[in-house]
Amino acid sequence: MSFHITPIWMWKGTGNNYAYLLTCDKTKITAIVDPAEPESVIPVIKEKTAKKEIDLQYILTTHHHYDHAGGNEDILSYFPSLKVYGGKNASGVTYTPKDKEIFKVGEVQVEALHTPCHTQDSICYYVSSPSKRAVFTGDTLFTSGCGRFFEGDAKQMDYALNHVLAALPDDTVTYPGHEYTKSNAKFSSTIFSTPELTKLVDFCKNHESTTGHFTIGDEKKFNPFMCLGLESVQKAVGSSDPITVMKKLRDMKNAA
């Protein structure tokens, strides 16, 4: 069953977070992903509900950090019947899906993919229908980048990006938790050069928002954190061991 996704930009100019509405086209049943800033998301929810464009039933939380889960309790005060999916450490959570557990939003299939590293409760949500695929990656995968290893290490991030997410179909559209693409692409350009990365840099010059425009297949071509085996990336960090490459890339990005 088909679906559509509506990004909501929060804390624009500071945190530059995204919440997302995931709506089943047939039933209008909707989940909202990481609605951390109620002031930004509640008016959108109310307007779309009044127009009968959505039937909000779920919150999907990618991890427990305040700028992702901190709005859950406030949202619940307005919409107390919502089911809140996420890690057990996240505010307001009523259900923690197991790794690779499948559930439905309306008639749309969603799979919870545990990707511990940025936090140990990080979950990506893979959405699929016969016609298209998408994944909400929180602070695990950013466009041409990845999250900091606050609660994990390079080995965990390598597994999350290059085993779990890389195994998704290449046409899976990515929806990260922040708008960091311009700075990520700038850093990536100091590591290696590909035609796809050049196009991404150009895209950022003309588009303030980049979420929903790129895919897992694109990430494999312009994200150095997903190109650990590429000779140019290995040369940039001085190692060919994938875990060491991942760690050095993250250290370099942190210092950039």
Swiss-Prot record:
A Pfam short name: HAGH_C
The EC number(s) this enzyme carries: 3.1.2.6
SMART domains for this protein: Lactamase_B (SM00849)
PANTHER family: BETA LACTAMASE DOMAIN, TENZING NORGAY, ISOFORM C
Protein name: Probable hydroxyacylglutathione hydrolase glo2
CDD domains: hydroxyacylglutathione_hydrolase_MBL-fold
Pathway: Secondary metabolite metabolism; methylglyoxal degradation; (R)-lactate from methylglyoxal: step 2/2
Cofactor detail note: Binds 2 Zn(2+) ions per subunit.
Catalytic reaction equation(s): an S-(2-hydroxyacyl)glutathione + H2O = a 2-hydroxy carboxylate + glutathione + H(+); (R)-S-lactoylglutathione + H2O = (R)-lactate + glutathione + H(+)
Source species, domain of life: Eukaryota
Subcellular location, record wording: Cytoplasm; Nucleus
Family to which the UniProt record says this protein belongs: Belongs to the metallo-beta-lactamase superfamily. Glyoxalase II family.
Cofactor annotation: Zn(2+)
GO process annotations (BP): cellular detoxification; methylglyoxal catabolic process to D-lactate via S-lactoyl-glutathione
Chain residues that bind substrate: R148, H178, E179, Y180, R250, D251, M252, K253
Residues annotated for Zn(2+) 1 binding in this entry: H63, H65, H118, D139
Annotated positions binding Zn(2+) 2: D67, H68, D139, H178
Protein keywords: Cytoplasm, Hydrolase, Metal-binding, Nucleus, Zinc
